[in-house]
Design a protein with these regions (language model features):
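N-terminal organellar transit peptides
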Residues: 1-15, 20-145
Length: 145
């Protein structure tokens, strides 16, 4: 079982990391910056370079939309928005909006994330899976880990 929690800022590659868990949480005051793939410094402006970045962006978009409940259209809209970030494109979303858009599963904090993880472990144990996980869970609950 996996649970993620965004407490401060889940920017850039933090978004795919957050949605990769089975359940994701975000604190109400936490933010996430959604923007397209880009680079800094000197880049040769060739069609090959452009195509490379386009392929990377497609992979990231596919991963995020397949591992969350946000639509491809909404994610792309956030990513390509102008007017929010002074010198760039993208969108900053905060806790409630991240949940309402389907990017993150629930609002919550550390307690909520740990309680959910504990319930997931218990459920896995009851269905016969993960004996080693359950032993580690019992040790964690009793303060041995």
């Amino acid at each position: 079982p996996t649970v993620s929690l965004v407490l401060g800022g889940g920017h850039s590659i933090g978004i795919p990391l957050a949605v990769s868990a089975q359940k994701s949480f975000i604190a109400p005051s936490a933010s996430m910056m959604i923007h397209p793939v880009r680079t800094c410094g000197v880049v040769v402006g060739s069609p090959v370079t452009y195509h490379y970045f386009q392929r990377i962006q497609e992979q990231i978009t596919d991963f995020v939309t397949e591992n969350s409940h946000i639509s491809r259209e909404k994610f792309t809209e956030y990513m390509m928005a102008t007017g929010q970030i002074a010198t760039d494109v993208g969108t900053i979303v905060y806790g409630k909006e991240a949940v309402e858009s389907g990017l993150i599963d629930r609002l919550g904090g550390l307690h909520d994330a740990l309680e959910t993880l504990h319930r997931m472990i218990e459920k896995q144990h009851k269905t016969g899976g993960g004996n080693k996980t359950h032993k580690n869970y019992r040790n964690l609950r009793s303060g041995m880990l």
